[in-house]
Amino acid sequence: IYSNVEAIAESQYVFIQGNALKERIQKIEKTDEKRFVIGECGFGFGLNFLLACECFIRFASPGSTLYYIAGELHPVLKRDLQRFIRLLPDTILSLANELLDTYPENGKTLHRITFNVSKCTIQLDLLYGDAASTFSSICQQKYQVDAWIMDGFSPDKNETMWNKKLCDSVAALSKPGTTFATYTSAGLVRRNLEEVGFHVTKSSGYGKKRHMLTGNFRQTPTISKKSTWSFPWDSTSQASAEKHRKICIIGAGITGCATAHALARRGFAVDLIEKDAEIASGTSGNPRSLVHLNPAQQLNSTMRFRFNAYLYALRQYNSLSKIANFNWQPDGIIQPACSEKEQDAITTLWQRQLYAEAHVSSVNAKRISDLAGYISNYSGFYFPGAGSLDPVALCQAWARHKNIRLFTSHEVLDFQRKDNQWCVKIRGNEEEITAQYDSLILCNNMDVSSFSSLPDYPLAYNHGQTDTYEIPENFKIPTKPLCNKGYLIPWMTAKKRMLTIGGCYAQGIHKLNSSKQLTQRNISLLEKLSPTLHKNITGAQLESISRIGTRLTTKDYQPLIGPVEDTLACKHLYSDLQRNARKTVQANPVYSPGLYINVGHGSNGLTTAPLAGEYLASIINDETLPLAQDEIVVVHPLRYLIRRLKKQEA
């Protein structure tokens, strides 16, 4: 770690002054959006970020937002960041400690971290991976960077960072007037930046460095954002409208409450409509649920979305639990193997080194026993930051915001677009009313198919059940949750030890009248996880409190999150795919204005809903998105129409 005093002085001179951040931030209050976007190549220890935040907090008008996007190929370890922060001055120490608390260990995905300071909001998007590739992955979004901090080693030590691909991505994320600053004055850097449309000026460098480069972007016809698009149909750039201040969300379960909270934090007025008498009355109302990750053999787009969502959920729950009580217990979760075959698969997966040990670690049978007081015959995975919580209390915490109005025992009968607003017919208190909203978000998983105006999404229903036992004092139970095919969660009320088990399900939309069969299936799953505990519970004939619920999922088991397409218009736009499935059609989709959907999370709602809500709020608020482009493809509602067109089924 280098000298902090010199590093701070150099950063202030080269990047803060080089981009004239103080003067430009002071002018934000004269704009309608009150936002400023900074991009950085090379996050390092976060010093440039902290100094930019300090400048923003000092000089931005109240209510302003700083969006900071940074790429980093080699993230520093958390312990090294901790050592670095100890040496920082008091002026940035508070924010630095908050960064340390939320700092994600290496994981090649996009990590969104939000800092709430006294008068403004700071939003950090950390993109782990090669800067050229990671910035390219977000070029299709509505990023328009105001200032670039081009840090990193000099080109002779890190030539790959300064290549033409990176400069193309930087240009695609810039707009006329975007500035940059870098301490290097190398000819390679200057030529590449000039070639993509920047006017470059050589200035006096800091200290012993004779020169540095600054400049501004002058958009030219040779720079086209479309040149970087791999999936043009998934663009969300047309999804946000000019006016989105009053929003209706249908469904007050986990996804609805998470989405409402994300929007309310941004100042939107949200009406949260729930047809049942209580919030989180469906499967969101289980007494106890897990927040966990299912590791896969490869980090493809689907798994990167899941991993991104998992880490984001942990950060949000850790932060929210400081001001709200939903019995969040991030004590870790163990996934033990239940056979030699499973143990071999876990060993093979671990050898791929896809996950940092801070997120997932391989543990042998003895270590499992030490961690959870549970005798295992096999090794397994340990998820240090995962845990369990009370879903109902969580939904209540999300909905308890001054910008959210909750209406229970109110049912949405229909909605239609009229005079640039959504007219929503609502029945409640023995009367029907029609309310007008700028935007409408469907989070009512079980009833979403009742709206005939929606596209024909391939939805599927699964019935599941949890069984909760009061555990006698003489019973020994694991001290941490266990999960495999099924799961068990030890937890406490004020005076009682409880154990919730689950994992069984039955497919179909039919109603289940009896839970006895599912209770036996849960007991069978428990036998695989903990034979001793299974024997004790069945031997003592403990009675369980059973709770049946129905979850909504989709044909490809990925949620539907995003703007709802205009089916007829999109069929016409992408009709060429019926003749050539591999053709790239350069056309933005047409959406139903202000209509969004967020359903189909299945049993992963607690893990994926926070990021899903953040993603929708970012679209509606016309800001940087917390998903990379290939992750958006995974959850975009339009994906099904595109697939049908390619298969000539539409």
Set out the residue ranges of the language-model regions.
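C-terminal catalytic lobe of FAD-dependent flavoproteins
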Residues: 537-650
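Helical element adjacent to the flavin cofactor pocket in flavoenzyme catalytic cores
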Residues: 381-429, 433-435, 439, 443-444, ...
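Flavin-dependent oxidoreductases
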Residues: 429-524, 530-546
